[in-house]
Amino acid sequence: MRSFGRTGGRPLSPRQKTLMAEKLDTYRIAEGDGPLDLCAMFPGKEAFWLEIGFGGAEHMIAQAAQNPDVGIIGCEPFLEGIAKALGGIEETDLNNVRVWPDDARPLIARMPDQCLDRAFVLFPDPWPKRRQHKRRLVQADFLSILHPKMKPGARLRFATDVKSYADEALLTFVSDGRFEWLAASPDDWRCPPQDHVTTRYESKRLGDCKPVWFDFRIR
């Protein structure tokens, strides 16, 4: 079951259409069923990170610019987000970002075991109605797909501004037993982490609570 709705939104601008036509193939991960070779995808990079649902790509582009030795894979099914990522990659002259314009789960399945040093799931679609909760990304089956791909000791960050999703996701992570919650005090989830990059979506405060950030270490 998809954890996102329609993949179209507002029409792309002429510049965005040009980026999609001319640059997408350069930065897109090729479709297929075969395993991914991250070392070949990111020659010389020392670590590999994954961002699932990067939205307007502000966080991903900033992290890539601040961490040039890291190869970052971003997954985003919405075309406008992909176009914004391509624009950010070109404007910042990055060589350490690749994008996947579809559901993250099939791509994660193609990754080698214990290859990821870090993962971000920031403000995913909250599916706020109770009958929609089954569509939320953070479920036990999703963790079973993601966990084997992360190195022992790797970090995962989840953020949301929807209280029911915060409660549900935290319970899902902690109940799994393979994700160690790193909070030592309430400020650790109430305050943005030091390396967090605020996005335009986050600034809109569309949820029903203040943003929370949960950081986990992989066991």
From Swiss-Prot:
Signal peptide (from-to): none
Reactions catalysed: guanosine(46) in tRNA + S-adenosyl-L-methionine = N(7)-methylguanosine(46) in tRNA + S-adenosyl-L-homocysteine
Keywords attached to this entry: Methyltransferase, S-adenosyl-L-methionine, Transferase, tRNA processing
Residues bound to substrate: K129, D161, T199, R200, Y201, E202
Pathway: tRNA modification; N(7)-methylguanine-tRNA biosynthesis
Molecular function terms, GO-annotated: tRNA (guanine(46)-N7)-methyltransferase activity
Enzyme Commission no: 2.1.1.33
Protein name, entry field: tRNA (guanine-N(7)-)-methyltransferase
Organism: Hyphomonas neptunium (strain ATCC 15444)
Phylogenetic classification of the source organism: Bacteria, Pseudomonadati, Pseudomonadota, Alphaproteobacteria, Hyphomonadales
Gene that encodes it: trmB
